[in-house]
Structure formats: structure tokens, C-alpha cells
């Protein structure tokens, strides 16, 4: 995925998702244009 920033962290941008996918260990997210930014802290 595309890198994105979320609360000062670098995360992964997921296109057209309303929430972070399970199984990746994400514990922080930010709403993004047409998707979501998911971060593993």
C-alpha cells in the first residue's frame, strides 16, 4: 500500500476501506480520503 501519516506515525493507506483489516496487528487508524490509514505502533 501507499505510505501515509497518522498521529505522527507512518502507516499504510488502504483504499476504499472503512476500517483496518484484521490480522495485520494495526492498533491506530486515521480516516483518509476514500479510505483509511492504518498504523502498527
UniProtKB/Swiss-Prot annotation:
Task: List the keywords (alphabetical).
Answer: Calcium channel impairing toxin, Disulfide bond, Ion channel impairing toxin, Nematocyst, Neurotoxin, Potassium channel impairing toxin, Proton-gated sodium channel impairing toxin, Secreted, Toxin, Voltage-gated calcium channel impairing toxin, Voltage-gated potassium channel impairing toxin, Voltage-gated sodium channel impairing toxin
Disulfide pairs here are 4-37, 6-30, 20-38
- Record GO terms (molecular function): calcium channel regulator activity; ion channel inhibitor activity; potassium channel regulator activity; sodium channel regulator activity; toxin activity
The protein's location, in the record's own words, is: Secreted; Nematocyst
**InterPro entries, per the entry:** BDS_K_chnl_tox (IPR012414), Myo_ane_neurotoxin_sf (IPR023355)
Give yes or no: UniProt keyword Secreted: yes
Q: Which domain of life is it from?
A: Eukaryota
- Please tell me one Gene Ontology term that the record gives under cellular component: nematocyst
Tell me the protein family, please.
Belongs to the sea anemone type 3 (BDS) potassium channel toxin family.
Extra remark beyond the main annotation: A synonymy between H.magnifica and R.crispa is controversial. The primary structure of this peptide is identical to Hmg 1b-2 from Heteractis magnifica (AC C0HM68).
The free-text function statement in the UniProt record for this protein reads: Remarkably non-selective toxin, with activity on many different ion channels. Weakly and reversibly inhibits rat and human homomeric ASIC1 (isoform ASIC1a) (IC(50)=4.8 uM, and IC(50)=14.6 uM), and ASIC3 (IC(50)=15.9 uM). Molecular modeling interaction with ASIC1a suggests that this peptide hinders the collapse of acidic pockets and stabilizes nonconducting channels state. It activates several potassium channels including Kv1.1/KCNA1, Kv1.2/KCNA2, and drosophila Shaker IR.
Name of the protein in its database record = Pi-stichotoxin-Hcr5b
Protein species of origin: Radianthus crispa
Amino acid at each position: 500500500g501507499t505510505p501515509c501519516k497518522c498521529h505522527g506515525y507512518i502507516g499504510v493507506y488502504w483504499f476504499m476501506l472503512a476500517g483496518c483489516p484484521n490480522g495485520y496487528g494495526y492498533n491506530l487508524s486515521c480516516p483518509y480520503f476514500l479510505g483509511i490509514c492504518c498504523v502498527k505502533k
